[in-house]
């Protein structure tokens, strides 16, 4: 029996699938010196506030009082960074380095500083002793920078704070960047997350002709905070089979001996990059895109590599204790201070830095120059590469509306035609993303110019409506996490996209969108970060048309979560009809640095506005619909407001009934498309002034607000408004099952009858005079419910309701 050279232990001489010694003694010395310097800087960032080059014995007052950061992953991160420098120079290769365990930021920041990129963007952190001192002190320090690969990190488009998105971001960056190789370093702890586990399948969505490549590197350092990682404790054979099953060719590099590990990693990366180039050359020369087995690397090294072996008698290097700060108490424990100094001096900084504190030229020579540097690549500052979309005139895709509320049309179908032509005009920098729902969401017109990307196996029946193609630009995979990651990185590297999903399942990516919002918010304060395209999400198949799927599909709460993010980043639009949806989509696709949430159902709905009116309504965000109001020139008795397509229809129906039953009642109808208009201008840049808000909604009249989502959100937005005490909101209240649309509306009190009753109850002049009408409205509710329970559909007079001319 042949014994495998591979081991679960990360220690010892290098063991690798690819063998060889490609580094000559000079290059080996240069690379090891660069890596030693990077590790020295990583320790300095965590511990030091002064004496950066140890020109004198280390003193307690030179140590930070609060020690923050993660040492454990840093040496592996900088080890790979060092070797990617060599690959870039050898192959003149464009590269982007994505660090999944972003908490190991010292391992990325150190090499970024050494190559000169950090000082390029932050001149105060110059490449000398004073600059190094500032560089050390600012890390995880008030007024400084964070402990992850934050937006302030040159070369980063992936913070790695919330784990799981490294590979989806890596693949999204590679789409339509044929000259780029993205190296995605996935942590072994990160690999236990659902999003990361699914994103390994992204290799089935790369076209080697038009796309770049991703080289995933699994960093097996064995431990998380204080637990072993799953993948580090399964056999070599099982681990190899896992990644072969994912469709990769895995190459292993294991060990802790620096010299042999440098040789093994250099040989492995040479082989992998050559293999990638061969795959691409064959596909591009033949024009035939087939799914290859892309290479990937499994790098097993000790956690806290090159750090203290033991501290206070406890194992540290190669164990979970090295995860964050290996030892503390520097101000009270002289032994720890002495051990820290010995640790830092083990890297021999006097050999690495000159008298000014600058990395010596012999070691810096391994780094690329200019924009080839990982910290300076324009791919990590995608706004520099961004080209504006070539937009068709959205007005040409609208529908004719001669009389408001008299014709029906599916709201999203014309949007699909519009997106088709956006796609046709931008076939290298625009993609549509959706979790197996684009046809369901009536965006299928895009398939006329570009199919769904598919490079796996085909079956004969796929020709009958499958809409599959190896050069498709519609990205569908039933993983909202993976899609969101692809799109975020696609945007962060300078391109454009559009994501359509079922409203209730947008919650799957709530946390990812939160993280992206934080990224955008910080970028606003960095003048060197160029503007990127906005993240545009259409939430359709909405709560009020999920009467057939039931309670689990009824959740409009994504809006509540997204509104917690910075008002400088978040925008929410609820267009009620085709023409307003087109106007909103056109605006969002051309915007920058925002997260635009568009809520609009896909089914056939009444159409209210011609294109001119819709554009005006969208531009203003909030508007009085004159044709639905009868208070012109006078003060209204009541304001009927609506946001969302179904709530708008029901509010209009209630208005029509009230005007029929009470001809002298003065009603103002207000349409809200831009939800953030409801906030005060002091809280949101779109917010109405108090004067404008009071003019629209009055200061003392009842406001009946029919809202698409949870009603409490409107109260949250308007609580400081003058007339908030008279604001009465109807929305989704967690009442639902398998219903008809009207039954669902009645259960949640957004139906026309409930709204009309509300008006009667709120107006003193109608409380008694309107009693007969009120009881009739209750009877009509009962009739609607009984009809639905008997026939399974709504009454014809409900389904066929139109605005009375």
Swiss-Prot record:
Family per similarity comment: Belongs to the XFP family.
Cofactor dependency: thiamine diphosphate
InterPro entries: Phosphoketolase, THDP-binding, Transketo_C/PFOR_II, Xul5P/Fru6P_PKetolase, Xul5P/Fru6P_PKetolase_C, Xul5P/Fru6P_PKetolase_CS, Xul5P/Fru6P_PKetolase_N, Xul5P/Fru6P_PKetolase_ThDP_BS
EC number: 4.1.2.-
Gene Ontology annotations of biological process type: carbohydrate metabolic process
Gene Ontology MF term list: aldehyde-lyase activity
Record keywords, A-Z: Lyase, Thiamine pyrophosphate
Enzyme class (EC, first level): lyase
PROSITE patterns, per database record: PHOSPHOKETOLASE_1, PHOSPHOKETOLASE_2
Record Pfam families: XFP, XFP_C, XFP_N
Top-rank taxon: Bacteria
NCBIfam families: PRK05261.1-2, PRK05261.1-4
Gene3D superfamilies: 3.40.50.920, 3.40.50.970
HAMAP family, alphabetized: Phosphoketolase
Name of the protein this chain belongs to: Probable phosphoketolase
Keyword Protein biosynthesis attached: no
CDD domains on file: TPP_PK (cd02011)
């Amino acid at each position: 029996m042949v014994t495998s050279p591979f081991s679960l232990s990360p220690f010892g001489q290098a063991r690798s699938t690819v063998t060889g010694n490609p580094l000559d003694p000079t290059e080996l010395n240069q690379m090891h010196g660069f890596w030693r310097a990077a590790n020295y800087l990583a320790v300095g960032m965590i511990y030091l506030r002064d004496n950066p080059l140890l020109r004198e014995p280390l003193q307690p007052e030179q140590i930070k009082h609060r020690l923050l950061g993660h040492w454990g992953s840093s040496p592996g991160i900088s080890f790979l960074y060092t070797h990617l420098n060599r690959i870039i120079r050898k192959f003149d290769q464009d590269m982007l380095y994505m660090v999944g365990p972003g908490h190991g930021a010292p391992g990325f920041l150190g090499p970024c500083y050494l190559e000169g990129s950090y000082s390029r963007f932050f001149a105060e952190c110059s490449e000398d002793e004073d600059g190094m001192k500032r560089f050390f002190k600012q890390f995880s320090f008030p007024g400084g920078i964070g402990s992850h690969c934050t937006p302030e990190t040159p070369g980063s488009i992936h913070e790695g704070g919330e784990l799981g998105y490294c590979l989806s971001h890596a693949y999204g960056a590679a789409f339509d960047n044929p000259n780029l190789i993205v190296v995605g370093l996935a942590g072994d702890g990160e690999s236990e997350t659902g999003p990361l586990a699914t994103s390994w399948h992204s290799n089935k969505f790369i076209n080697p002709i038009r796309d770049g490549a991703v080289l995933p590197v699994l960093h097996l350092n064995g431990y998380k905070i204080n637990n072993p990682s799953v993948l580090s404790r399964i056999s070599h054979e099982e681990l190899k089979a896992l990644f072969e099953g994912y469709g990769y060719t895995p190459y292993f590099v294991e060990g802790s001996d620096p010299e042999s590990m440098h040789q093994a990693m250099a040989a492995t990366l040479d082989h992998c990059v050559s293999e990638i180039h061969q795959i691409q050359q064959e596909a591009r020369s033949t024009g035939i895109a087939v799914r290859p087995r892309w290479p990937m690397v499994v790098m097993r090294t000790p956690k806290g590599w090159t750090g203290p072996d033991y501290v206070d008698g406890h194992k540290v290097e190669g164990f979970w204790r090295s995860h964050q700060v290996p030892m503390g108490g520097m101000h009270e424990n002289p032994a720890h201070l002495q051990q820290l100094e010995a640790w830092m001096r083990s890297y021999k900084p006097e050999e690495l830095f000159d008298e000014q504190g600058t990395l010596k030229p012999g070691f810096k020579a391994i780094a690329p120059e200019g924009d080839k540097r990982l910290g300076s690549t324009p791919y990590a500052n995608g706004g520099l590469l961004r080209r504006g979309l070539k937009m068709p005139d959205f007005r040409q895709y609208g529908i004719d509306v001669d009389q408001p509320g008299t014709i029906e049309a599916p709201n999203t179908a014309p949007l699909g035609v519009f997106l088709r032509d956006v796609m046709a005009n931008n076939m290298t920098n625009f993609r549509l993303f959706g979790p197996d729902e684009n046809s369901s969401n009536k965006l299928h017109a895009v398939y006329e110019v570009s199919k769904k990307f598919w490079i796996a196996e085909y079956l004969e029946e796929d020709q009958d409506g499958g809409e599959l193609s190896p050069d498709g630009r519609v990205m569908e995979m039933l993983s909202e996490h993976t899609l969101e990651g692809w799109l975020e990185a696609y945007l962060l590297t300078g391109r454009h996209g559009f994501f359509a999903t079922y409203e209730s399942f947008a919650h799957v990516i709530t946390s990812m969108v939160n993280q992206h919002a934080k990224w955008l918010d910080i970028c606003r304060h960095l003048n060197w970060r160029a503007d990127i395209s906005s993240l545009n999400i259409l939430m359709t198949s909405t709560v009020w048309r999920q009467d057939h799927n039931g309670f689990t599909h009824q959740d409009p709460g994504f809006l509540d979560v997204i509104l917690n993010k910075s008002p400088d980043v978040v925008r929410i639009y609820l267009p009620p009809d085709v023409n307003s949806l087109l106007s909103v989509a056109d605006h969002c696709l051309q915007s920058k640095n925002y997260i635009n949430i568009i809520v609009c159902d896909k089914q056939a709905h009444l159409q209210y506005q011609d294109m001119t009116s819709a554009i005006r309504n969208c531009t203003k965000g909030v508007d009085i619909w004159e044709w639905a109001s009868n208070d012109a020139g006078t003060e209204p008795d009541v304001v009927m407001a609506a946001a969302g397509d179904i709530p708008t229809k029901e509010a209009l129906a209630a208005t029509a009934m009230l005007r029929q039953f009470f001809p002298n009642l003065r009603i103002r109808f207000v349409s809200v498309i831009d939800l953030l208009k409801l906030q005060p201008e002091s809280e949101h840049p779109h917010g109405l002034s108090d004067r404008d808000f009071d003019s629209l909604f009055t200061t003392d009249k009842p406001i009946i607000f029919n809202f698409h989502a949870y009603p409490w959100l409107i109260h949250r937005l308007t609580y400081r408004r003058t007339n908030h005490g008279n604001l009465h909101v109807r929305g989704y209240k967690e009442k639902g099952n398998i219903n008809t649309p009207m039954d669902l509306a009645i259960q949640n009190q957004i139906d026309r009858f409930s709204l009309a009753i509300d008006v009667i109850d709120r107006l003193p002049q109608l409380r008694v005079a309107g009693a007969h009408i009120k009881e009739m409205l209750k009877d009509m509710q009962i009739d609607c419910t009984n009809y639905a329970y008997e026939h399974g559909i709504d009454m014809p007079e409900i389904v066929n309701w139109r605005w009375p001319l």
